[in-house]
Regions:
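Glycine-rich Rossmann-fold phosphate-binding loop(s) that bind the pyrophosphate
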Residues: 5-6
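Gly/Ala-rich phosphate-binding loop of Rossmann-like dinucleotide-binding domains
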Residues: 13, 17, 102-103
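Residues at the starts of beta-strands that form the adenosine-phosphate
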Residues: 21-22
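Conserved acidic E/D residue at the C-terminus of a beta-strand in Rossmann-like folds
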Residues: 27
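Rossmann-like adenosine-cofactor binding region
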Residues: 30-125
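Rossmann-like dinucleotide-binding domain for NAD(H)/NADP(H)
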Residues: 81-177
Length: 177
């Protein structure tokens, strides 16, 4: 299952299909509508989405509306043999929900690249030391293509700013260029 219908989730879908996985989608109402328009399989409900997949991978941006959007109830609906994957942001998971869910065996395993406190203190973090968790130190995005995309975007933004024509402004109302 893929939660979120953005660029990264679509790339992950290709990998999943290469391994013979059937992909189901969930996300915002708009994301589900776009996925459906693209002919993707949308879960019949949020509950079914968390209860069905062998692997559930999260690909959502963290913003005030998405903070804590994956709840203890959601995790508790996952199968005991399911893997929960989060390479997006730790804040998408309700505070304090993941460790008890893992201890209860739902989901049965987690693969994490993001943590509540980064850099992670490996020796003292109960999630990092959980026997059913695989961790990487927030390096899941590190690919040649991703570096090229990020640095090209940064270069474009700096060049535009130097020409007094900034792009991708979050608060254009304060620009007095």
């Amino acid at each position: 299952g893929l939660y979120g219908y953005g660029r990264i989730a679509k790339i992950v879908e290709g990998y999943a299909k290469a391994f013979g996985m059937n992909v189901i989608w969930w996300g915002s109402e708009d994301g589900r509508a776009r996925a459906a328009a693209d002919g993707k399989t949308i879960s019949e409900s949020r509950e079914a989405f968390f209860a069905t997949p062998d692997v559930l991978s999260v690909h959502v941006r963290l913003k005030p509306a998405t903070k804590g959007m994956i709840t203890a109830t959601d995790l508790g609906q996952m199968r005991q043999d399911a893997v929960f994957v989060n390479t997006s942001r730790a804040g998408l998971i309700e505070d304090g929900a993941l460790l008890p869910a893992l201890n209860a065996g739902r989901p049965g395993m987690a693969a994490l690249d993001v943590f509540d406190h980064e850099p992670i203190t490996w020796d003292h973090d109960p999630i990092a030391n959980h026997p059913n968790v695989i961790c990487t130190p927030h390096i899941g995005f590190v690919t040649e293509d991703e570096f090229e995309l990020q640095f090209a975007d940064i270069f474009d933004q700096v060049a535009a700013f130097a020409k007094c024509a900034p792009i991708h402004m979050i608060n254009p109302q304060v620009w007095q260029g």
